[in-house]
Amino acid sequence: MSAIHSRDTLPEVVVRKMLWENGYRFRVCDKRIVGHPDIVIPKCRALIEVRGCFWHQHGWEWDGRKLVQTAICATATRPKSNRAFWNAKFRRNVRRDAEHEKAWTADGWNLIVIWECGLKTAKEREKTFAFVLRNLAEWGKKV
């Protein structure tokens, strides 16, 4: 797991390039904000989290007590060996994500979560980028 990068992943770089090309300026992993979100766009008061489906268990949510499956994502598989370790790890990751989201919205930030599977094909990227740009344009008007 030491080879797994927590920042500057290919999906993050793809999203940052799209934002830059569309005129949005941002900060990366701003340490002044709890949880160090992947991308911070102060002008729109927006945070963008680019999450890997496997590590953040896309399709699973923390309901306060346990993980609950809410959707199916082919990339969010679970290893068959050492299940206790992986279940505990994924539970911690999803719980931490939920805590950060709650803190960010309480602080008045607008949040967009982009899942790795939403960047796989050109069609999915186009749909994801349209959603992101539409929201950023709307939030930019409010500031």
Regions found by a protein language model. Give the residues of each.
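Nucleic-acid endo/exonuclease domains
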Residues: 1-143
